[in-house]
UniProtKB/Swiss-Prot annotation:
Keyword Ribonucleoprotein carried by entry: no
CDD domains: ThiG (cd04728)
Protein name (record): Thiazole synthase
Pathway listed: Cofactor biosynthesis; thiamine diphosphate biosynthesis
UniProt source species: Mycobacterium leprae (strain TN)
Chief location: cytoplasm
Amino acid sequence: MVESKFTIGDRTFTSRLIMGTGGAANLAILEEALIASGTELTTVAIRRVDTDGGSGLLKLLSRLDIMPLPNTAGCRSAAEAVLTAQLAREALNTNWIKLEVIADERTLLPDGLELVRAAEQLVDAGFVVLPYTNDDPALAHRLEGTGCAAVMPLGSPIGTGLGINNPHNIEIIVAQARVPVVLDAGIGTTSDAALAMELGCDAVLLASAVTRAVDPPTMAAAMASAVTAGYLARRAGRIPKRFWAQASSPELMRTGEELGN
């Protein structure tokens, strides 16, 4: 079996599926889904949880030995995101942050200018920064240049389930990146997750596709299998696409023709 571990910053992970927690009906279902996914890293919206010891979510992640990845979800400016990251570091004793700076509430698309400003400040402050970014190769490259530990381009807007709208751009981001690329947002079903890995992404981050599924634990297990399948397919190397058919057993075909003559 091909080795599947990958590294972000100073941490190495076995699972290439990163989970989010938003949209879960309750903690019991979320727990089943997290276990089924096999994830080792799960995002936490720092502005939406009680960090003073009363958060059932944080206790759940601790019990399951899953590393929490605080994010700056809901922030609209670099200043707001930096402050939220600082609060997360103090509350959770971690310098890891998933950086989100959105342009508006309707699309939840990243604000590239504010994102870069926040990334520069957080990297300078010693954070391991994982930015949620547009599927823009130039912006992803700029974020990598600031010192981000990974880049996390969207497949499509958060929660839409539209899959990967611009696979070519994702391939470009992967080709030029020297840090891990994590497909983040827009995953709707297993084929989307597998495609992300086939395009060369190092991991997939998803939440709604599991938490809002009819059967979240089963979907979580399916997503884990899809990520593994896509990763192995990428490593194995797909056959080139051809315009014309090509017999899979040419020698046998010729022998049959000779017998027919």
